[in-house]
Amino acid sequence: MEVEYMNFNELNLSDNILNAIRNKGFEKPTDIQMKVIPLFLNDEYNIVAQARTGSGKTASFAIPLIELVNENNGIEAIILTPTRELAIQVADEIESLKGNKNLKIAKIYGGKAIYPQIKALKNANIVVGTPGRILDHINRGTLNLKNVKYFILDEADEMLNMGFIKDVEKILNACNKDKRILLFSATMPREILNLAKKYMGDYSFIKAKINANIEQSYVEVNENERFEALCRLLKNKEFYGLVFCKTKRDTKELASMLRDIGFKAGAIHGDLSQSQREKVIRLFKQKKIRILIATDVMSRGIDVNDLNCVINYHLPQNPESYMHRIGRTGRAGKKGKAISIINRREYKKLRYIERAMKLKIKKLKFG
């Protein structure tokens, strides 16, 4: 029988961590935090956790890491993320939770000068980064993982989708053999389970409860009515969310069409420079743009807790991407909606997603 921890005081955490948690405004642990934190702190097993975006999974491993890592022993923990945006978010979350503990966190990802990273690695206790740049440092001899006790693989299914698994294996093999491994993934494709079997031996499997705060529905329209249907959904003045498209070209065209008729819409796509992309995300977080059009690839790393809706203007390629998309809303205990716009031919694909992910997606009456 699983224990329900009603507040963080019951998790045997230090006063330092409890103060940091209070300062962040966390009131009680989420489902994944209740399950992972005590197991990570009090057990020697490796952990595989199925938890979606917005479930509180980052804090579920950040809190025990802060308690367990010794600030005087060099690099004891490494966290791999699929994108630099997620690496920054994870590092920032650890910084915000470490309180008075003098832990040094190094952010290691591409697109930044390598020499400041080399300097940061010399004093680091926890390394957070993307596989490519981490491997670069290992090959240069500027990152030694032989003392690593804790290896965290975040968003493993996204790593798989982006072709990073071979790099992940190289990094695993560069680490101390006695390390503990924690693997987090929104979905559990066969390849991820094979990875766990190969490197983790016996492990505890944890599955977070499905987020009941997300109301999922679909609208069925003729293809030539898709844009009109979107506009009707966006007319709600309270709308603040993401609209997912299939291609880069679609995102640009859709954002332009929406702006032409008065909507505060922005797009994030591969033709933007990093600074342009950061500007769009900043405007979105400030709610100067309330509608952000994106593809699956370009939306990775957008971390906003109060989005009230996600719209699939086009259905994603697979059920896993659907779960990552809808996990952008209904976060931090708030309610959210996920609405898919489909034509008649796409109905079977939607039902396949529903069956594969054990969901209930109801038809929205559009009268």
UniProtKB/Swiss-Prot annotation:
Task: List the transmembrane segments.
Answer: none
- Residue span of the signal peptide, if any? none
Q: Which reaction does it catalyse?
A: ATP + H2O = ADP + phosphate + H(+)
**Gene Ontology molecular-function annotations:** ATP binding; ATP hydrolysis activity; catalytic activity, acting on DNA; RNA binding; RNA helicase activity
- Main EC class the enzyme belongs to: hydrolase
The EC code for this enzyme is 3.6.4.13
Locate the Helicase ATP-binding domain: which residues?
Answer: 38-206
- Tell me the protein family, please: Belongs to the DEAD box helicase family.
The protein in question is named Probable ATP-dependent RNA helicase MJ0669
The species this protein was found in: Methanocaldococcus jannaschii (strain ATCC 43067 / DSM 2661 / JAL-1 / JCM 10045 / NBRC 100440)
